[in-house]
């Protein structure tokens, strides 16, 4: 790991306020469709804090599932080798599925997860991400709910790591490399 420090990009208060808004929007969306079998799938490890907070803001009965994906390794750039290292425990056939992601960068991870889950015949599949870096997108994936659009910075905090560090920060910070 290179010598660095972390500057605040999005404050803890702003993160929590936006999650409350997203939860209300998601609740309204599914209530209007009279959906009562929502499965929320968190993509680990980065989404664990966001997942815990967003499901508490969704005012509907939900089932919780997790998948673990990997595409970063221990560096600061993503690669196209997306691996599923932990799959869902339950069946999603005929159920409405909401994928919860920490950050969308190139789009490859979400494309692979979405394709895998669609093969399992859910009734619907939607996506909510805390952070979106549209300037880095290489694969377009439809995303229904975005917390924050951010510039092309390497970010940490609120579950997101740099070489397994900084996940515990309550805010979103940008990594600044030091000379």
From Swiss-Prot:
List of residues binding IMP: 101, 105-110, 133
Active site, UniProt feature: 105 (proton acceptor)
EC number: 2.4.2.8
GO cellular component: cytosol
Coiled-coil residues: none
Keyword Protease assigned: no
SUPFAM superfamilies: PRTase-like
Cofactor(s) recorded in Swiss-Prot or TrEMBL: Mg(2+)
Family of this protein: Belongs to the purine/pyrimidine phosphoribosyltransferase family.
NCBIfam families: HGPRTase (TIGR01203)
Protein name according to UniProt: Hypoxanthine phosphoribosyltransferase
Organism from which the protein derives: Haemophilus influenzae (strain ATCC 51907 / DSM 11121 / KW20 / Rd)
